[in-house]
Amino acid sequence: MEQLKHECGVAMIRLLKPLEYYEKKYGTWMYGLNKLYLLMEKQHNRGQEGAGLACVKLEANPGEEYMFRERALGSGAITEIFENVQNNFKDLTSEQLHDAEFAKRTLPFAGETYMGHLRYSTTGKSGISYVHPFLRRNNWRAKNLALCGNFNMTNVDEIFARITAIGQHPRKYADTYIMLEQVGHRLDREVERVFNLAEAEGLTGMGITNYIEEHIDLANVLRTSSREWDGGYVICGLTGSGESFAIRDPWGIRPAFWYQDEEIAVLASERPVIQTAFNVPVEDIKELQPGQALLISKEGKLRTSQINKPREKQACSFERIYFSRGSDVDIYKERKRLGEKLVPNILKAINNDLDHTVFSFIPNTAEVAFYGMLQGLDDYLNEEKVQQIAALGHNPNMEELEVILSRRIRSEKVAIKDIKLRTFIAEGNSRNDLAAHVYDITYGSLVSGVDNLVIIDDSIVRGTTLKQSIIGILDRLGPKKIFIVSSSPQVRYPDYYGIDMAKMSEFIAFRAAVELLKERDMKDIIASAYRKSKDQIGLPKEQMVNYVKEIYAPFTDEEISAKMVELLTPKGTKAKVEIVYQPLEGLHEACPNYRGDWYFSGNYPTPGGVKMVNQAFINYIEQLYQF
C-alpha cells in the first residue's frame, strides 16, 4: 500500500527512413519525436522525479550541432521537456514546419535517433545533474556518447577503482557518471583501433572519419565495458556518429523489449507501450535476452549480439506483481493467478465463511489480483453448490435450491483514495493525523459486527500506510475481523537492483522477526548473524553468504505475520486483524518465467547482492547499538 519507487524506464527509437518519408506519409517529420513522447508517457509509472531525452542527427556539417538533449525535474517533466523541444519551432511558418529538408538542415532535434528516460532515484541523489541522459562530448563525432539506463550496480566502488587506476578522473561518485566514463573510455579505444586500421589503408582526413563511422563495432565496446558490472541493468546509448545500442544484464533482472519494421526500430522497458504506440501485435515484439545487446548501425542495420554469457534467468518478479503496467497480456494473467493462488489461505483464515465475508482491494494496482481472487472464490463456491445440490437427491426442494443458487461472493468497493489529500499531506507535523484520511470508505458496504472484511493488496513492505491509515479507516465500518491479504510473499530483504528498499529496518517482516527473537530469548541468533556477517568483510564477494536468513529461520511465515499484526494494529482498533501472505511457491506458480525473488527469499542472483545485504545488516546492528 505504500508506493515503492523503482529505477526508471527507457525508450529508444531509430528512424529507418529519411525524414521526408514521415512528412509525406504521416504529415510530419516529427514522427519519431511524437512516438518517443508516447512511449515515455505510457511508461510514466516508471519514473516521476525527472525525465530527459537525447537526439542525434545523422547529417550535419562541421561547425553544426548534431547531438541534442533536454532534461527536467518533477512529475511534469515529460511535458516540460517536449514543450521545450517544441519551443524551438514556434516561430516557424507552416511551410517551414512541414519542410523536412529544412528541418534536417537547420532545426535542433530533427534527427533520426532518439532516446528517452524516466527517473526514479533509488540512491537518494537528486537534482537536474542526475537526470539522464548523460552526455560525453568530443570533437570526434564517433567519440560522443549519450547514455541512460534502468539500473543499479552493486559494485560501483570496484568500477570506480578500475577506471581511476587507468588514469581517469570522474567528476562525481555516482554510478551513471562512472559508467559514462567507463563506456566512453572503451568507445575512445574502439575509435582509436579503427583509426589505426584506416591509416593502414592509407586513408586521410574525412576518409578516416567516414571509415571509423562505418567500421566501429559497439559489441567490442560493450563487451569490454560490461564484463565487470554486477547488478540489474538495461543501459541504452547513442553515439555522435549515429549508432544506437541497448544492453541487458546477464541475469535478465531488468526488462527490455524491442520491435522493428521497415520504418522504425524501437526499444522500451515495457512491452504493451510498444503495442499501443505502434499498434502492433504482441507476437511481433521481442524480448531482449539476458546478456544480449541490441545494436543499430549508422546505416540503420539492426542486429542482436550476445555480449555476456547468460546466467540462470532471475527476472524481477516485482515487475510482474506491481511495477509494470497491467495491460501486458501476460502480466494481466499472472496477476490474476496471484489472486487465485491466495484462495486456499483466505478460506482457511475466514473459516470458509463466505456468506459473512466482504471482499475488496486497496490500492488500484491490486485490482487485477482482486479479480483473480474473486474468480478462484467463485470456482470454490460453485463446487460447494454442486455438492449441496447433489446431496438433495433426485427430487430437490425448490426453496432449498433457491437458497443454494442465491449464494454469491460478496465484493464491494470499500475504500476510495483521495488523490488531492495525498498530495497535500506529503509533508508537515500533522501528517500522521491527516494520513488517516487518505482513503474514504463506503459506509454500509458490510454488516457491522457480523461481516468479515478481506482486503487484497499487491505488497506489504514497510506497513506504514496500514498502521497510519488503512486499518483505522476500515475499522470504522465495524467488521468482525479485517484480513489484509498480500498477493506477494513477505518482503524480508533489501533490493540492490533498482527498487527503493535498501535498509533492513524498513521491512516490517524483519522488525517482526527481530521482536520474536527478543521475546523468546533468542537474541544470540542476532549476535551470531552479526558476527558471521562481520567476519566476511574483506572476503571476495563470490565467497560471501547471506547470514540474514538466520534471523527468519526459527519462525514460520504465520508466526512472523502474527507479530506484524501486533506491530501494525493501531491502539483502539475494535476488529481483530490478520495478515495473509502469498506463499513463495504460489508466486513461482503464478509467474513461472520470473524467478527473481531475492527480496522474499534472500537468494540474490549476483555476488554483489550478497555483499550488500551483508553490509546492510551490519549497518543496522551498529546503528541500533551505536557501535
Segments the model singles out, each with a brief description of its role:
Residues 359, 366-373, 411, 421, ...:
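Extended, hydrophobic alpha-helical segments in both membrane/secreted and soluble proteins
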